[in-house]
Amino acid sequence: MKKVLALVVAATMGLSAAAFAADNTAAPAPAAAATTTTTAAPAKAPAAKTHHKKSHKKAVEQKAQAAKKHHKKAAEQKPAAEQKAQAAKKHHKKAAAQKPAVEQKAQAAKKHHKKAVKHDAAKPAAQPAA
């Protein structure tokens, strides 16, 4: 039984057919018949692959296509001066968006003031109900 198991393991590991046949002759006849049925599937050669021929373009067309790609890439790039101006615009917007510290402090004060007003308004409404 151990030899049968060893043969199955050997077949799955892909040992050569000659070594596999030598092991089969040493095994008893019933065991050999059992191993040939179990290992026949892994020993099969893979199905023949059909090779599809790739259609090759002419070298001139390929070169022209590559030139087109590089040309597009160059056209998309902005000049360095414009890029710098764009960065300056961004920084300018950021500076304009910031509020002065005084206004921010006033906003915080407004929030606290509103909260206090809401609290005071809620108390008188509760008193007449009681």
Swiss-Prot record:
Residues spanning the membrane: none
Keyword Signal: yes
Signal peptide as annotated in the record: 1-21
GO cellular component, one term: periplasmic space
Segments of skewed composition (Basic residues): 87-96, 108-117
Primary location recorded for the protein, binned into one broad class: periplasm
Propeptide: 22-86
UniProt xrefs under Pfam families: Asr (PF06392)
Alphabetized InterPro entries for the sequence: Acid_shock (IPR023497)
Claim: Signal is one of the keywords in the record: yes
Subcellular location: Periplasm
Region (Disordered): 26-130
Modified how: Proteolytic processing gives rise to the active protein.
Keywords carried by this UniProt record: Periplasm, Signal
Stretches with biased composition (Low complexity): 26-48, 97-107
Function: Required for growth and/or survival at acidic conditions.
Family assignment from sequence similarity: Belongs to the Asr family.
HAMAP family: Asr
Protein name, per record: Acid shock protein
Originating gene: asr
